[in-house]
Every structure is written in structure tokens, then in C-alpha cells.
Amino acid sequence: MSNSPESSTPKQSIPARFPKWLRQKLPLGKVFSRTDGTIKNKGLPTVCEEASCPNRTHCWSRHTATYLALGDACTRRCGFCDIDFTKKPLPPDPQEGEKIAASAKALGLKHIVITMVSRDDLEDGGADALARIITTLHIELPEATIEVLASDFEGNIDALHHLLDARIAIYNHNVETVERLSPLVRHKATYRRSLMMLEQAAQYLPDLMIKSGIMVGLGEQESEIKQTLKDLADHGVKIVTIGQYLRPSRRHIPVKSYVSPETFDYYRSVGEALGLFIYAGPFVRSSFNADAVFEAMSQRERLSASIQ
């Protein structure tokens, strides 16, 4: 019998109301305003705004942001995502690396997180453009660590290796949901291909921190979350984020359930038993508190190395 907090409670197909644990105060202030001004002054899209992230005020009030590279429109139309869809995006901006570097300098970032729209219109999926951005950041901010949340490059392993050759601290690629729901949630992406890309990254650079993330509340079962965590661990992933799916608008996939904080704690214990570093909670997203997660994982690896 399952020991999860939700094992004895009935499932609701449609949540009746917004639970209290998903209500939060907005920490606006001078730091938020400065971050907002710095980003807009450089004309840079962020996933914070384009994807309607609920943590934007929190992160910007901490002088952190996640840059959205290769444009603000995506060649895929995933059912959970609020980023605009287009079949013909603009060419990559050759000055994007310099713009991100200038913004990161102004914000004093020591850990820079970059995500990207899927660019299926480009032969390499945008890997070279992203690698060039990373190279520029290394030149302009040599002390900063860089985390990249990349697309699946349509399974192009050469493109993945080219990106990884640019030297990053964390490679992140999200499976987003359990295998059964993946065809409903993700457009032109597959669960198994995502696992393959994660495994390829782990094999190519064994010391690289490999990260992935999943959303809950989409209709998944507890057993499926457990299997997903096992799959991720078996494919070389070291860090997993787990957060509540929140519907950006009525045209997106509806929320099937609101997962309790106790259940997030339970999933954390399941993942930790598999050797994973789990960051889980209702508002957790792939890049939420990414700097703190990176530091905690770094400390864990240093401790592990000292014991051996």
C-alpha cells in the first residue's frame, strides 16, 4: 500500500477552487523595478514574462531572471506553455549574446540561466546560436556559471554535443510530464527522446550536472511519477524539479488536480531514495531559485568527493 499523503483521498477531475497554498504575496519593490527596467532596457525576452511564470515578482525581487534565447516565439505549440507559436520565426539575433551579457552584468548575476524556444526551422535546432551566446558570456562574465534549459533539437546528438562543448555548469532538459501524458502535453516532442538526450549528455560529459523537470496536476498517477523519477535517475539525471501545473489561460490544458505540499514532500523522498537531488513544491519551476539549487548540488558533490 502507498504511503503517499494522497493515497487515501479521492481524486478530483476538476478542482473546485484555488487552494490556499497557491496564494502568495507579491514582493514588489525597488529591486523588482530595477530588474524590470534593466531587462526591458536591453530589449530582451525572458521566460518569466513570455511564459507567464507565477514566480516573476519573486525572482525579479531577488535580482534574478531567466533569459529566453533565439526569439520570443516558438515553433512548437505545447498545451501547457504560454509562449507564442510561429511557423516562421525571425533569424537568431547575432548580438543576443552581448545583450544578455550586458543585462547580466547590470544585475550582478553570478549564475546565469538561459532557456530557449524550440527552433525546428533551423538545421541544428538553434544549438550553434545558443553556443555562441554561451561563449560570449564566458568572455564577458568569466566568473559566472551558466545553466541552459535546452530543447530536444529533434534528437540531433551532434547539435547537443556542440552545445555542451561551449562549457556550461548545468544542462537542463525537461520531460515535463509522465510518459502516458506526454503526447497530450508536448507538441512534436516525445518522452523517450527526451530521456535519450539526457542520457547522451550524461555520457558525453560524465561530470556535468544534468537536470530535468516535471509538472504535476495534469492527471498523472502516483505510480507514474515514481516511474518517471526512476527513468530520470536511470538516464543520468542528477537534479529534478517538481512543480504544480497552473493553466496560463482557458485555451491551455486544464488543471486536473492541485497537489498538496505534503505530496510534494513525499515525491521528494521518493526521488532522494533514488539518489536524485529533488527541488519540489507548488511554485517550483525549472529555473526557480536555480542559483541556490546549483550551490546546494555543488556542496553535495563536494561532500561526496571528500568522503570517497
From Swiss-Prot:
InterPro entries: Aldolase_TIM (IPR013785), Elp3/MiaA/NifB-like_rSAM (IPR006638), LIAS_N (IPR031691), Lipoyl_synth (IPR003698), rSAM (IPR007197). SUPFAM superfamilies: Radical SAM enzymes. Binds 2 [4Fe-4S] clusters per subunit. One cluster is coordinated with 3 cysteines and an exchangeable S-adenosyl-L-methionine. One of its GO terms (molecular function) is 4 iron, 4 sulfur cluster binding. Its cofactor is [4Fe-4S] cluster. [4Fe-4S] cluster 1 binds at residues 48, 53, 59, 287. It is found in: Cytoplasm. Its main location: cytoplasm. Residues 60-277 form the Radical SAM core domain. It is an enzyme of class 2 (transferase). It comes from the Bacteria. One of its GO terms (cellular component) is cytoplasm. The keyword Electron transport does not apply. SMART domains: Elp3. It catalyses: [[Fe-S] cluster scaffold protein carrying a second [4Fe-4S](2+) cluster] + N(6)-octanoyl-L-lysyl-[protein] + 2 oxidized [2Fe-2S]-[ferredoxin] + 2 S-adenosyl-L-methionine + 4 H(+) = [[Fe-S] cluster scaffold protein] + N(6)-[(R)-dihydrolipoyl]-L-lysyl-[protein] + 4 Fe(3+) + 2 hydrogen sulfide + 2 5'-deoxyadenosine + 2 L-methionine + 2 reduced [2Fe-2S]-[ferredoxin]. Its EC number is 2.8.1.8. Belongs to the radical SAM superfamily. Lipoyl synthase family. This is Lipoyl synthase. It comes from Chlamydia muridarum (strain MoPn / Nigg). The lineage of its organism: Bacteria, Pseudomonadati, Chlamydiota, Chlamydiia, Chlamydiales.
